[in-house]
Amino acid sequence: RYSIIRAVTAVERADVVILMIDGVEGVTEQDAKIAGIAHERGKGIIIAVNKWDIVEKDDKTIYRQTERIRQVLSFMAYAEIMFISAKTGQRLHKLFSMIDLVIQNNSMRVATGVLNEIMTEAVALQQPPYDKGKRLKLYYITQVSVKPPTFVIFVNDKELMHFSYTRYLENRIRDAFGFRGTALKFLIR
């Protein structure tokens, strides 16, 4: 209980959360709770799989381990995953580069004009949903803050904006700008 309180305090203070997972044990319930807190707070996140030096490996080990982590922490598909060894120093220099990248992405600002071009293109590729004969119209999108990057989408009727279409727009924005290791927030107005 006390460790969770300390973890929450650390997450609150952090720009980037490094979730250290035991490479042998995998994602624990407590790891998932801390990941959820970091996600809710909109923190940048890197999942560091530690003890990689003692894990029995073949040519598919990283792929299988990544899939397991992505399955358990499916709510944060944007998180970066790195396989490290604190004991041997394996890939630790890359971890620091990744921290810098995530901080940069979490602070990234995108011009309204560029966002609206992406939205227009996305709408042309996949029409917005409609309900009872009424179609969703997207007027424009703008970024209102960073840490985490937060976007406001102005629409004709926010009841028509389904979470799956918001996710679709998020994916188009990620395709264009990356936002690696960074949660994105969307407000519908």
Give the ranges of each region predicted by the language model.
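C-terminal-of-GTPase-core extension/linker across diverse P-loop GTPases
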Residues: R1-I5, T9-M20, V24-R189
